[in-house]
Each structure stands twice: as structure tokens, then as C-alpha cells.
Amino acid sequence: MFPMVTEFMNYGQQTVRAARYIGQGFMITLSHANRLPVTIQYPYEKLITSERFRGRIHFEFDKCIACEVCVRVCPIDLPVVDWKLETDIRKKRLLNYSIDFGICIFCGNCVEYCPTNCLSMTEEYELSTYDRHELNYNQIALGRLPMSIIDDYTIRTIFNLPERKT
């Protein structure tokens, strides 16, 4: 008779323990239910990028002195700088400047080391195309400023993301 009573007691203890574990899991689920969603609906919602975001490079043709520092500091020798030496004034004249964003790793060395600050990083990160040759930007394409995300009325911008607890 005693073995049967102890089995019922063990069964009762196991049932209470299982209910407690299920309750703990349910409480964790409920605590996550009132948090803001982490996922954004990308084409319709966009995050505001930080000031230090390394997006597409903006180039100012008038400021460039064709010193080629950007080419020397680039880990993959990417910027193509074509210049002509003006013998009468003994200065280089910039003819063409281009960057292939299909190869660029967006390290920002060219922007950091440019002595005249003619290069800057923008907040533009949507560079996808169907043809990789369209990613080769010349000085005209590099000179265009991107449309600001805040000014685009077709999308909802998300300013504050919920902070993750670690």
C-alpha cells in the first residue's frame, strides 16, 4: 500500500513542477509581449542612419587637387584619378575621377585622409542594380547628393529603436 501512495505523491510533485515550469515560460513570453517590435518593414520603413554611417561616397570636383592620396590609402587601390600636368602653372588638373562601388569595401580611408575634404560619406546605402557596370560612378554621379531619408514622404522613418538589454 505504501508504494502506491508514494507513487501518487511523486506524480503530484512532478505535476506541480511541470506546471511551475510552464508558468515560468509563460511569464517570460508575457514579459516580451509588451516590447516594441525589432523588425522594420524595409521598403516602407527606414532607420535613420548615424552620423558615422559609411554609405556612398560624395565627391566635390572643385576641391580635388589630384594628389592621389585616396588611391594610396585605399586597401584595394580603387579610386581612378586621371589628371594632366599643367606646365605653365605647375599644377595637376583633374580630368576624371571614378569609384566602382561594386568593388569598394566602404572602409572610409579615402575620406579620412583626403587633405582637401573633397570626399565625404553619405547616408545612401541603396546601391543595388541589375547590372554591375552601373555601380561604376564617375565624378558627375559622385557629385550628386542623395535624397535625405527624412525628406522622403513615401516612407516612414524610425528615429528611436528600442534599446537591447544585454
UniProtKB/Swiss-Prot annotation:
GO terms for biological process: photosynthesis, light reaction. It catalyses: a plastoquinone + NADH + (n+1) H(+)(in) = a plastoquinol + NAD(+) + n H(+)(out); a plastoquinone + NADPH + (n+1) H(+)(in) = a plastoquinol + NADP(+) + n H(+)(out). NDH is composed of at least 16 different subunits, 5 of which are encoded in the nucleus. Pfam families: Fer4. Binds 2 [4Fe-4S] clusters per subunit. The lineage of its organism: Eukaryota, Viridiplantae, Streptophyta, Embryophyta, Tracheophyta. This is NAD(P)H-quinone oxidoreductase subunit I, chloroplastic. One of its GO terms (cellular component) is chloroplast thylakoid membrane. It is found in: Plastid, Chloroplast thylakoid membrane.
